[in-house]
């Protein structure tokens, strides 16, 4: 229990000096001790100070600086609750932001009152573009702006009375935090994925296996004969972090590359809405694809919304099929294998041409010197030579997004002037490039089967290519047939079903050395570099030959240097040929260093990219468990206690992780996927005991509001709009103008943002908390209506009046020793049982409804004074929702300790059983009356009561029913 506060908040604060806006004008004459916005402000301010002074929400760790000072063990019953932490924007919070924070606070407070050791803290995801863009505009260092925003966020969140352990708060921009982000990067960099063991292992173990001869090189070279540089190349190719010349999403308007997940479906940047181009650049990549199977399979053990699981499954995109090797001839005469992946190997005999992604590595090698005799002009794209046609086609599609390329109704492409041999038929087929084939999926090459794939059919029709039927059942002259059937025109496969043919052709490809069964994924490796300033620097330097070297852990943190200009070189948003130029390159003294990496002092250059904004959020849950540890990112004992598997509690396949994580579904394939990947690597390397970061996830809905636009589509301030005669007008500078209402997000740009400060000023933070929780289920979006806040305010006033005399400030509670009457006991214990069940399930809206119902019951039942035994449980039940008011009433009721640690009241099952049952009485199927009988009444007693009811008798008018049907506990039906 927490010690008693030394001050009595609100009890001597005096009468309110004015009326908060939004509250009934009658409150200007309110009694001195009424619960008003001013009184609430005093109560809330003082209790927040008390909680901070007493460390009410400080939670102990098993070991380290936050362990109990007396050496006592931590409670076994723990709960780790986490919110997706906010980005501290300059605009501050609007009323939609606290929805999830309040919900988790109610959940945490309830379980804390039930005696659990609850970890609940909140940090800030503070790296990112907005602070950097502000710095570019003003010349202010991003840290200055970010820290000011964090101060404002903490002030706003503090007003809400959230029960966070403030000792555990941090920002991802804190050097003490991003030191460990860099450390984790090094763990991943210095690891490789052992496919046989299906896990990551230290790279040193791979080197040892090569040195000992236990592992051979896949290309057949002798490890012992390789030079130091060649060995380094081999090792670098195995690392989980590697550099690759790969196709990336280049955004000239932002001056940086973007991950696939940061590009919208129409090929523009998610932030700024600039065009994004596909460009080949050398970039840092993380080998997340090595974990594709585990990321998919472990979704089954997570208590997550089906929507999020489906989004991750679709993003990872596992496909089962086969690879097939077509042989082609390079322009220099060498034979080369062209590997394709297909989920339909059964259609191999129907492959009449090949299509490569325009970015495929082999395209330039396969371009013919000239057009073959008799080439169809439709195939050439108007080019004088294949090389000219390919170059022109690549230029034409450079600005298209992947989605545009895949969904385009018009199929285009050009012939390379060369052919490949179909391994099933032995016949040559022409090779094309086309934009509907993507380099990032499969092998970047497809075998085109126009008879049974509609995109291939469309392409074949457009370019006059042959269409062959290999599965009977459709009319391929009209469209591709994608249904089931038996194989035809397929040699030894003829007559087989699709399933049989898949197995048979795969076996033949394997035996002939022309292919094999294979699983492919849509998931691509994670592009892990940004050409920005405000992000975590890489702990990487380059030697004079351009070879990367990881810094030793002792060199961490690598701190961001000051630079004269924070902006990358920005380009015309449509300039696809531009090249990135990171801001850190301007800090020349920081970039160029002399270091001793074990072979003497030598010159090196630092990496001038920074990590993406997702880096800090990929592991921050772990830092909450041990935020002050200077020696490790977190002590294993603390991680095991807060996040380790608990099979006795959660089942034998419990993956461990945070007990409850709440945040938006928009992060399903970004933050949540990246965090799972990092956590699994840390698990494989033995740094954590949990194999997943988040055991249970809930996606909160959104608070939405009306916005208003004028005839030009420009938004006007929503609070100034007047509703009149079924329409809306805005009093502009030149008089009233008609405006148009729309419903959706809340935001500064829509001019409909409402600050929680306004509601706290006008009603108090507890009212805001109760209102937001009463609006609907946590997962549902809901409309904001300031006019409805008064309902929550008046509910809290009624609770206050049950305890406090508004005129005198005296306690109204009856300290009678007599036992409560049966009706009150039944109402009390039903409320306790229902509210407890709702809190545990995060059904806060129905908990509010039950508390209102019980409050109304007490108000009507006990008009003079409510018995203490009836009111104290109400105060305890209200505490998770309205903690300031509850603490104040609890103290005024004579208690000397805070109720933050309980006890939460327990329901007596004896009062949860109904003594009576109400039966609707139907006559020929229509309800004509209702009767109340004892819960254990037999059918005869129920029939007698129904027939004796005055309303039923009046309707029967002396007639006798032919039949009386009793459905036990539900209804009586009289058939006349």
Curated annotation (Swiss-Prot):
It is found in: Cytoplasm. One of its GO terms (molecular function) is aminoacyl-tRNA deacylase activity. It holds the Pfam family Anticodon_1. A motif ('HIGH' region) lies at residues 86-97. PROSITE patterns: AA_TRNA_LIGASE_I. ATP binds at residue 748. Its EC number is 6.1.1.4. InterPro entries: aa-tRNA-synth_I_CS, Leu-tRNA-ligase, Leu_tRNA-synth_edit, M/V/L/I-tRNA-synth_anticd-bd, Methionyl/Leucyl_tRNA_Synth, Rossmann-like_a/b/a_fold, tRNAsynth_Ia_anticodon-bd, Val/Leu/Ile-tRNA-synth_edit. It is an enzyme of class 6 (ligase). It catalyses: tRNA(Leu) + L-leucine + ATP = L-leucyl-tRNA(Leu) + AMP + diphosphate. Keywords: Aminoacyl-tRNA synthetase, ATP-binding, Cytoplasm, Ligase, Nucleotide-binding, Protein biosynthesis. GO terms for cellular component: cytosol. One of its GO terms (biological process) is leucyl-tRNA aminoacylation. A motif ('KMSKS' region) lies at residues 745-749. Residues 1-23 have a biased composition (Low complexity). Its main location: cytoplasm. Residues 1-34 are annotated as: Disordered. This is Leucine--tRNA ligase. The gene is leuS.
